[in-house]
Amino acid sequence: MRSNMHQGHVARKRFGQNFLVDDSIIHGIVNAINPLADDVLVEIGPGLGALTDPLLERVPQMQVVELDRDLVERLRRRYGDRLQVHAGDALAFDFGRLAVPGRPLRIVGNLPYNISSPLLFHLMDYADHVHDQHFMLQKEVVDRMVAEPGSKAFGRLSIMLQVRYHMEHVLDVPPGSFNPPPKVDSAVVRMIPWPRTESGRLRSPHADCDITVLGDLVTAAFSQRRKVLRNTLSFLRDQIDFEAIGFDLGRRAEEVPVGEYVELARRLGGDASDRSAA
């Protein structure tokens, strides 16, 4: 049985710590990120520096957000001025204050699986400051993020993130690549925010809408996943003439494309691109 101790540090379950130790996977992730010397690189949860080390071979400085106080001090001692360490919870961190005019953030990380979905939604607030994001996540979560309509994995997470990002499944990572090994398979995803026009609209294939309205709509739609939308969205009949717009309520929630949910949200909340901006 593999010990939870790695490089003199005991992995803490409450922080969801699983340290990446597979060199081939590490190099694959760094190559996928392909950092350039002038990038503003931000790592969430650097841990013991498995990604930090090879990334600092390509960039002169980085910023990291780390919650574990023991690791914060260790990182500061090890990297000195090359690493600006922000001690705190990424779920409450203001990533916007790291942005540099004309140099959007490149955010990376082996994210704690116990907070991955809330953290992804938190980061949506800063998408206008971001060039791209590369994250290690539970494979099931990545599958849901990139899922197509009609698949079992397609759901609220798929819709909410696909409206704001173009996403790609980069590579799979087996449990043995970590110490301690998690009980699930992992994967790396690339997330590229859809840019905005000069007027503030998203250049997304799914148009633009009020994210809060969309979130409430999708939550209702998927509240009874096995039933058709006639059962979950009928309360909206006074606000939307579904027949007039050709929206089939005889489908299940996972059968409806992202664009159709966005259109419903626009009808419910109007054109609110300015409210969905970070």
From Swiss-Prot:
Cross-referenced Pfam families: RrnaAD
Principal subcellular localisation of the protein: cytoplasm
InterPro entries (alphabetical): KsgA/Erm, rRNA_Ade_diMease-like_C, rRNA_Ade_Mease_Trfase_CS, rRNA_Ade_methylase_Trfase_N, rRNA_adenine_dimethylase, SAM-dependent_MTases_sf
Domain of life: Bacteria
Signal peptide: none
Keyword Methyltransferase: yes
Record flagged with keyword Transferase: yes
One Gene Ontology cellular component: cytosol
Membrane-spanning residues: none
Catalytic reaction list: adenosine(1518)/adenosine(1519) in 16S rRNA + 4 S-adenosyl-L-methionine = N(6)-dimethyladenosine(1518)/N(6)-dimethyladenosine(1519) in 16S rRNA + 4 S-adenosyl-L-homocysteine + 4 H(+)
Broad class of enzyme this protein falls into: transferase
SMART domains per record: rADc
Binding site for S-adenosyl-L-methionine: 18, 20, 45, 66, 89, 110
Similarity comment: Belongs to the class I-like SAM-binding methyltransferase superfamily. rRNA adenine N(6)-methyltransferase family. RsmA subfamily.
Function: Specifically dimethylates two adjacent adenosines (A1518 and A1519) in the loop of a conserved hairpin near the 3'-end of 16S rRNA in the 30S particle. May play a critical role in biogenesis of 30S subunits.
Protein name: Ribosomal RNA small subunit methyltransferase A
Organism: Cupriavidus pinatubonensis (strain JMP 134 / LMG 1197)
